Amino acid sequence: MPGLSCRFYQHKFPEVEDVVMVNVRSIAEMGAYVSLLEYNNIEGMILLSELSRRRIRSINKLIRIGRNECVVVIRVDKEKGYIDLSKRRVSPEEAIKCEDKFTKSKTVYSILRHVAEVLEYTKDEQLESLFQRTAWVFDDKYKRPGYGAYDAFKHAVSDPSILDSLDLNEDEREVLINNINRRLTPQAVKIRADIEVACYGYEGIDAVKEALRAGLNCSTENMPIKINLIAPPRYVMTTTTLERTEGLSVLSQAMAVIKEKIEEKRGVFNVQMEPKVVTDTDETELARQMERLERENAEVDGDDDAEEMEAKAED
């Protein structure tokens, strides 16, 4: 299929003060020439004076060809097609929002472009028409370009009727729903943290058990927490959830409860690994590690048994 392309949003040009994602194409004496990724790669320029608040010693340390950058629009001449941009005026918070919006808008774009592939569209105008009848309808409805379409598509995974108001024929609707489900159906993630819990007092074992039990009680129906012993005093905490952020938060809360409980008994609590999403590779490595420790413990137990038998024989 020819490389169909279309801008992400209904407006052909960004507005002044919009923070947009660009890709650096070339660097010249006056500044850097870039492509506005959300606006079908139209050209813009970041003047040298707008690259950094500090004195520029090396332009290559500030900006590199091929890299994506979050920049703010400072001037737009729609007739001549000139767009002036600034990197230095973008705050860290604005950059984070820009990246989030770009990621979600790009997901919507990928879904609709794949729909166009399946339906064998051959012209950019056909892809733009699809945007007009789907993504831009929701962007306009919710007054949130980029986010409106993404949120509506995500909602369509559990309730496809949200697409009923769109001007789509049967084939378009079916292919769109299939692609939305393929790209946006939530995937369960496993979250893990490694901790050390110990208490060397008179009731040390009971204190550790009580603290870990308090952590387990932070489980919810949707986010059950498991705690497994790796090797004293190290434990691994895990939970599986569809909500990554909530999962990280629940595990952090459970760790705080365990810390509080064990320290009440003058015990020790250390974080070996902060809560994080783990991959299958991480899980395989953990299983291998626990297996090895089990074998080592079994060997130690075997040595103890042999020593006991020798002692009895001597008696």
UniProtKB/Swiss-Prot annotation:
UniProt cross-references to PROSITE patterns, sorted A to Z: S1 (PS50126)
Acidic residues biased stretches: 299-308
GO CC annotation: cytoplasmic stress granule; cytosol; eukaryotic 48S preinitiation complex; eukaryotic translation initiation factor 2 complex; extracellular exosome; glial limiting end-foot; membrane; mitochondrion
GO MF annotation terms: ribosome binding; RNA binding; translation initiation factor activity
Keywords for this protein: Acetylation, Cytoplasm, Initiation factor, Mitochondrion, Phosphoprotein, Protein biosynthesis, RNA-binding, Translation regulation
N6-acetyllysine modifications at: K141
Record-listed Phosphothreonine modification sites: T279, T281
Protein modification: Phosphorylation at Ser-49 and Ser-52 stabilizes the eIF-2/GDP/eIF2B complex and prevents GDP/GTP exchange reaction, thus impairing the recycling of eIF-2 between successive rounds of initiation and leading to global inhibition of translation, while concomitantly initiating the preferential translation of integrated stress response (ISR)-specific mRNAs. Substrate for at least 4 kinases: EIF2AK1/HRI, EIF2AK2/PKR, EIF2AK3/PERK and EIF2AK4/GCN2. Phosphorylation on Ser-52 by the EIF2AK4/GCN2 protein kinase occurs in response to amino acid starvation and UV irradiation. (Microbial infection) Phosphorylation by vaccinia virus protein E3 and rotavirus A stabilizes the eIF-2/GDP/eIF2B complex and prevents GDP/GTP exchange reaction, thus impairing the recycling of eIF-2 between successive rounds of initiation and leading to global inhibition of translation.
Transmembrane found in the keyword field: no
Subunit structure: Eukaryotic translation initiation factor 2 eIF2 is a heterotrimeric complex composed of an alpha (EIF2S1), a beta (EIF2S2) and a gamma (EIF2S3) chain. eIF2 is member of the 43S pre-initiation complex (43S PIC). eIF2 forms a complex with at least CELF1/CUGBP1, CALR, CALR3, EIF2S1, EIF2S2, HSP90B1 and HSPA5. Interaction with METAP2 protects EIF2S1 from inhibitory phosphorylation. Interacts with ABCF1 isoform 2. Associates with ribosomes. Interacts with DDX3X in an RNA-independent manner. Interacts with CDC123.
Protein name: Eukaryotic translation initiation factor 2 subunit 1
Natural source organism: Homo sapiens (Human)
Gene (UniProt): EIF2S1
